[in-house]
Amino acid sequence: VAARIAESPALRLGGVECYEGSLVGRNGDVDRAAVKALMDCVVSVAEACDQRAYFAGDEVLMTAGGSALFDLVTEGLLPSIKRQVRGVLRSGCYVAHDHGVYHQQLKAVETRLGCSASLQPALEVWAMVQSCPEPGLALLTCGKRDISYDLDLPVALYWSTRGSGPRQAVPPQWRLSALNDQHAYLTFPADSVGPAVGDLIGLGISHPCTTFDKWHWLPVIDDDYRVVDAVTTHF
């Protein structure tokens, strides 16, 4: 492909791109070996293209994308070639992070880097309790059209009783068990105090990408949950 690009009067080879995110196996040693093999291949391709003068311009772009193994690809973004190299990480989930799959995967990154609390989740979806049809079950006004569900179900985080204002953490036994198009099933111990119709439930997401694509704009709030701004999405 690189040779054909170099021969083309309409194309220019600007760099080498890869995506390591599909290699995630949630096993540190396996992940490290898989990413090393990929990046060794990427470096070899870049060096071969450089030796054959396939790159156009004075700067070569080396880029990898993914929000789980980004720390493992960085060394492979700086191959030893004649031209100047610009390494670019295309990780996107760091913008909002999450309370689910990336929260778990980040723990491995933090262990490898020797840090903690490096990213904080910043995206929540709030829903109202619409019905309590039976003990231990509440139906929320939030579903597959509103929140991500492809990797994990949302996580119940906060509870604000009707008219009270302040939020509180939900009891640890509260779980989302299923989603319909427009409803979420919140389960809790039937013999305990549960939410009532009109209460608000704050949900944490798992996988920011498939929540962003459901909203054309998002309110921005301060620490007291007052809306202070808004952002539009183009996902």
Description of each model-found segment:
Residues P133-F235:
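C-terminal accessory subdomain/extension
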Residues V1-L113:
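Active-site loop/helix belt of alpha/beta enzymes
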